[in-house]
Curated annotation (Swiss-Prot):
Keywords: DNA-binding, Repressor, Transcription, Transcription regulation. Negatively regulates the expression of the gbsAB and opuB operons. Required to control expression of these genes in response to choline availability. Also required to down-regulate glycine betaine production once cellular adjustment to high osmolarity has been achieved. The gene is gbsR. Coiled coil: none annotated. Signal peptide: none annotated. GO terms for molecular function: DNA binding. This is HTH-type transcriptional repressor GbsR. InterPro entries: HTH-GbsR_regulator, MJ1563, WH-like_DNA-bd_sf, WH_DNA-bd_sf. It comes from Bacillus subtilis (strain 168).
Length: 180
């Protein structure tokens, strides 16, 4: 039986967007398979794990793991329907909400990891700089590194404030959403 060409064109358009969503998520450290899962859920309404597994031909444990990852990122929600035993899940369809849920935690983690490392490194450098009879070349190298680390703190302060402004929605005062 021949497939309806219009239906095939719709499916091709849907697959094109799913693939681009998966590729974009891969750029930000989310596996391609989880990106395909999100893209598929984005294109559909609520889905059960069985429906996801059937559509994507992946194992149920893989589906569960992928959905859990997307829930942890706060871009997929479990939905409740009285009288239905199977859980259904729905993807966040508003990309602005997706953005405000997805990026700030990553930025906050970057700030936390790097500021902690900088503070530890600067403490170690202070110990080196406090030594008497310190070789001038070593002192200069330690000072140069200390200053470089100190100047990088401005970036992490800015990134922390950016994360906060995205989470609170304040960023949209400066870069408003234009509806088309």
């Amino acid at each position: 039986m021949d497939e309806n060409p219009e239906f095939a064109a719709i499916e091709q358009a849907r697959d094109l967007v799913i693939d681009s969503i998966a590729e974009t998520m891969d750029l930000y450290g989310i596996t391609r398979s989880v990106g395909i899962l999100y893209g598929t859920m984005y294109m559909r309404d609520e889905m059960t794990l069985d429906e996801m597994r059937e559509e994507l031909q992946m194992s149920k444990p893989s589906m569960s793991t992928g959905v859990k990852k997307l829930q942890d990122l706060n871009v997929v929600k479990k939905t409740f329907h009285r009288g239905i035993r199977k859980h259904t899940f729905v993807a966040e369809k508003d990309f602005f909400k997706f953005f405000t849920n997805f990026f700030p935690p990553k930025w906050e983690r970057e700030v936390q990891v790097n500021v902690t490392a900088i503070e530890e490194a600067q403490a170690d450098l202070q110990k080196v700089l406090c030594k008497e009879d310190l070789d001038e070349d070593i002192k200069n190298e330690a000072l140069q590194l200390y200053d470089q680390l100190e100047s990088s703190k401005a970036y992490y302060d800015w990134l922390k404030r950016l994360a906060e402004s995205v989470q609170t929605g304040e960023i949209f005062k400066f870069i408003p959403v234009e509806t088309k």
